[in-house]
């Protein structure tokens, strides 16, 4: 896979064909034989599947030029997150004036959360 044809779709299709061929070359083990023989065949088959998985991952990362796993999204600490509901509470379904945004606010710390929650007793 070191040579590139120049067409990324063609390269990807070629990689998928190679991976498909690898998986087809290792069918499920035969369910006949003694219990120990079946166990050994399954163990060897699982080891081959792990090798095929790692090869497939390497082929795809080479073809795509990036790792198969996405880079984890860096989020701010949960203490700094809050919903911005200062003016739009209770106005569900109405349009906001130009220039105002609602939804998830910036990383602001809500101070009035204990007053809103109260002590937990009903009136």
UniProtKB/Swiss-Prot annotation:
Q: What is its main location?
A: host cell
Subcellular location(s): the record lists: Host nucleus, Host nucleolus; Host cytoplasm
Which parts of this chain are annotated as the region Disordered? 25-50, 86-123
Any GO MF annotation of the entry? RNA binding
Region (Homomultimerization) location: 18-26
Q: Its function?
A: Escorts unspliced or incompletely spliced viral pre-mRNAs (late transcripts) out of the nucleus of infected cells. These pre-mRNAs carry a recognition sequence called Rev responsive element (RRE) located in the env gene, that is not present in fully spliced viral mRNAs (early transcripts). This function is essential since most viral proteins are translated from unspliced or partially spliced pre-mRNAs which cannot exit the nucleus by the pathway used by fully processed cellular mRNAs. Rev itself is translated from a fully spliced mRNA that readily exits the nucleus.
Record's miscellaneous remark = HIV-1 lineages are divided in three main groups, M (for Major), O (for Outlier), and N (for New, or Non-M, Non-O). The vast majority of strains found worldwide belong to the group M. Group O seems to be endemic to and largely confined to Cameroon and neighboring countries in West Central Africa, where these viruses represent a small minority of HIV-1 strains. The group N is represented by a limited number of isolates from Cameroonian persons. The group M is further subdivided in 9 clades or subtypes (A to D, F to H, J and K).
Provide the domain comment: The RNA-binding motif binds to the RRE, a 240 bp stem-and-loop structure present in incompletely spliced viral pre-mRNAs. This region also contains the NLS which mediates nuclear localization via KPNB1 binding and, when the N-terminal sequence is present, nucleolar targeting. These overlapping functions prevent Rev bound to RRE from undesirable return to the nucleus. When Rev binds the RRE, the NLS becomes masked while the NES remains accessible. The leucine-rich NES mediates binding to human XPO1.
Name-wise, this protein is Protein Rev
What is the primary gene name for this protein?
Answer: rev
């Amino acid at each position: 896979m070191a040579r590139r044809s120049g067409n990324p779709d063609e390269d990807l299709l070629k990689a998928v064909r190679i991976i498909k061929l690898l998986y087809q070359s290792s069918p499920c083990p035969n369910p006949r034989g003694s219990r120990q023989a079946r166990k050994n065949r399954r163990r060897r088959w699982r080891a081959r599947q792990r090798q095929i998985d790692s090869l497939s991952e390497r082929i795809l990362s080479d073809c795509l030029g990036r790792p198969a796993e996405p880079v984890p999204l860096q989020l701010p600490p949960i203490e700094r997150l809050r919903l911005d509901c200062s003016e739009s509470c209770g106005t569900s379904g109405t349009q906001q004036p130009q220039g105002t945004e609602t939804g998830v606010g910036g990383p602001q710390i809500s101070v009035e959360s204990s007053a809103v929650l109260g002590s937990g007793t009903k009136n």
